[in-house]
Amino acid sequence: MGVTEEALSGEGRKQLEILAEKDILKKPWLLFISPMLRCQESAGILFPEKKAYPIEEWREMNFGAYEGKNYEDLKNNSYYQKWIDSNGTLPFPEGESQQEYIKRCQRGLHAATKIIEEKIAREVADTAKTSSANEITELREPEKQIAESQMIENQIAENQIAENQMTESQPRNITAVVHGGTIMALLHILAGGNYFDYQVKNGGGYCCKLRLCGEEWKLDSLEEITI
């Protein structure tokens, strides 16, 4: 299923409930989802108390005229045979190409990165304010004014240093509840290799260790998660 909105099946819900009970998925510091219904429902089962941030660009691929069809439906279609021979790189009729979809998912990765950076910056700022406020309350009034002025002048530089240190020293658990196609596209971007190397079963996924280097993510490790 691609762009068609469809709720989880009863069997799918049971699979996710089993996964939620296992000690595999850690509570995320930040939770991203595809805005499509099946991902919203999946996230609600796996992380019921966690706020989810939808990434519009992480919707499933648009399969166009092939939406909802399987091999038996298409095996006598000449263009479908060409699509298979192209390793799935030809665009779907009335839909997306693999490359278009990868680029869309990459835009979503940039959007998610911005949310991550903003959340870290807020945490750093809150920590700095609390620390500075505690120090200032112990000063006399004239000294407070000087301290407050100095604090404002130094705030941006200190926050940037603290943000860099916080990012490096405190790894965070970030979870994305998305589609199989989205997983393949993102891992193709991050790890290279063939787009179809990263296929997973329903309810499956990958655990990745990533580092943000400038504006690019670097992949340190990759492990498949299965139910």
Task: Set out the residue ranges of the language-model regions.
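Short, solvent-exposed aromatic-acidic interface loops
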Residues: S221-I227
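Short, low-complexity, charge-dense intrinsically disordered segments
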Residues: E123-A128
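Active-site-proximal alpha-helix that buttresses catalytic centers in soluble enzyme cores
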Residues: M1-K50
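Short beta-strand scaffold positions
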Residues: I33-S34, K103, V177-V178
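Domain-level recognition of soluble alpha/beta enzyme cores
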Residues: N194-K218
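Long, intrinsically disordered low-complexity tandem-repeat segments
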Residues: I136-T137, E141-T167
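Generic beta-sheet signal
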Residues: W29, Q170-G180
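Phosphate-handling substructures
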Residues: A7, L46-R107
